[in-house]
Amino acid sequence: TAGFGVFTNIINGGLECGK
């Protein structure tokens, strides 16, 4: 997701945000 992607980017190393 876009909103959660920012935080997920830091946690998962950019899996969601890098999608």
Swiss-Prot record:
EC number from the UniProt entry: 3.2.1.14
Major location category of this protein: secreted
Gene Ontology CC: extracellular region
Coiled-coil blocks: none
Keyword Ribosomal protein: no
Intracellular or extracellular location(s): Secreted, Cell wall
A Gene Ontology biological process term: chitin catabolic process
Enzyme category, top tier: hydrolase
Annotated family: Belongs to the glycosyl hydrolase 19 family. Chitinase class I subfamily.
Entry function: Defense against chitin-containing fungal pathogens.
The protein's name in its UniProt record: Endochitinase 2
